[in-house]
Curated annotation (Swiss-Prot):
It comes from Bacillus subtilis (strain 168). Transmembrane segments: none annotated. One of its GO terms (cellular component) is cytosol. This is Aldo-keto reductase IolS. Coiled coil: none annotated. The keyword Transferase does not apply. NADP(+) binds at residues 155-156, 175, 203-208, 214. Monomer. The gene is iolS. In vitro, is able to reduce the standard aldo-keto reductase (AKR) substrates DL-glyceraldehyde, D-erythrose and methylglyoxal in the presence of NADPH, albeit with poor efficiency. Shows only trace activity with benzaldehyde and butyraldehyde. Is unable to oxidize myo-inositol with either NADP(+) or NAD(+) as a cosubstrate and also does not use glucose, 2-pyridine carboxyaldehyde, fructose, xylose and succinyl semialdehyde as a substrate. The physiological function of this enzyme is not clear. Does not seem to be necessary for inositol catabolism. Induction: Induced by inositol. Repressed by glucose. Is cotranscribed with iolR, the repressor of the iol operon.
Length: 310
């Protein structure tokens, strides 16, 4: 079984993880079935997926609780749990809070919901506007020294915020948006993360299915669908993106897989990226994602895709 090391941490993970926002994330998806979500987590662990990525905001703690229920059925040491916090309830809304007290409290509350003694990777989910980022990370380092967390991550940070957060060299992982249609991170983040041995975990890797070969140039989306608001899905740009994605079909055919496996394998071929955490709602989607780990792209494949989406 392939394993990858996350940044400076001692965490070893299978290169395909599971994003669990559809496990108990009732505030994100309507009509979620909790038993289906729990079965998805079970299937992930049974099939060798070691990393489960969750967050307080996924169902306002419910995702963590459901994962905690499933964890009891397995050896805790076989699973790498990543969770995130930054959302503090204020009236009927949420505000971002990176204050040391709030983050420490969040770690303790996540431990209870997950029904575990330690969290493998704890992220600051979003930056707030006022807390010095090194102070926020130092609070998490106290939790690490206490054995409550094993490694520290930040998510959605700018490069300047990341540098401030990593002032004492304590950040193990950065999670941020990166995909073939938005390669900005290659310029902004990758030189820094590479130099400081910080693992970059991309989210939004298939751009709402656009890079999965699911759509044609004539595909339209219902009124109110979020994809209508995304630049990549608008007008001529959408059609051009579809044409590019279709050019990946021969490579997929050659490797006997589908287009999304080729896209995901291209990310994993980058030295800055150790693991991907595609989401799934059903076990069959998860099993399909796992196939990516068996795809080894040739240098020719990698260069072709690089130029196609330059």
């Amino acid at each position: 079984m392939k394993k990858a090391k996350l940044g400076k941490s001692d965490l070893q993970v299978f290169p395909i993880g599971l994003g669990t926002n559809a496990v108990g994330g009732h505030n994100l998806y309507p009509n979620l079935n909790e038993e289906t979500g729990k079965e998805l987590v079970r299937e992930a662990i049974r099939n060798g997926v070691t990393m489960l990525d969750t967050a307080y905001i996924y169902g306002i703690g419910r995702s963590e609780e459901l994962i905690g229920e499933v964890l009891r059925e397995f050896n805790r040491e076989d699973v790498v749990i990543a969770t995130k916090a930054a959302h503090r309830k204020q009236g009927n809304d949420f505000v971002f809070d990176n204050s040391p007290d709030f983050l420490k409290k969040s770690v303790d509350e996540s431990l209870k919901r997950l029904n575990t003694d330690y969290i493998d990777l704890f992220y600051i989910h979003f930056p707030d506007e006022h807390t010095p980022k090194d102070e926020a990370v130092n609070a998490l380092n106290e939790m690490k020294k206490a054995g409550k967390i094993r490694s520290i991550g930040v998510s959605n940070f700018s490069l300047e915020q990341l540098k401030e957060a990593n002032k004492d060299g304590l950040v193990d992982v950065l999670q941020g948006e990166y995909n073939l249609l938005n390669r900005e991170a290659e310029k902004t983040f990758f030189p820094y993360t590479k130099e400081h041995n910080i693992s970059f975990i991309p989210y939004f890797p298939l751009v709402s299915g656009l890079l999965a070969g699911k759509y044609t140039e004539d595909t339209t989306f219902p009124e109110g669908d979020l994809r209508n608001e995304q630049e990549h899905f608008k007008g001529e740009r959408f059609k051009e993106n579809i044409r590019k994605v279709n050019k990946l079909a021969p490579i997929a055919e050659k490797h006997n897989v589908d287009i999304p496996h080729i896209v995901l394998a291209w990310y994993l071929a980058r030295p800055e990226i150790d693991i991907l955490i595609p989401g799934a709602k059903r076990a069959d989607q998860l099993i399909d994602n796992i196939k990516t780990a068996d795809v080894t792209l040739s240098q020719e494949d990698i260069s072709f895709i690089d130029k196609l989406f330059a």
